[in-house]
């Protein structure tokens, strides 16, 4: 369940991951989607370079999953801005940034911008 709330960073370095309740072996599109959502601009390219090559169908699924996760984060932020239950105002900007990375990614040259 990799998303910004479950990743712990200390001084700009990954120091932990929380919430392994949804961990499973399965579609690699989930791993690729997580990279778009949790990594900052430019950092995802290293992940994509290190990850085994994914075919076009996997990348399409990953982009869809990343967009879905991003929209969910934006909804949490929206709800937090309005004081609604379960809302977290800090999630909105993270969701917007992730969605921007997903929408502007291009195959080939795009991995460097991911």
Question: What name fits each language-model region?
Answer:
Residues 22-25, 34-114:
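Helix-rich C-terminal or lid/interface subdomains of diverse kinases
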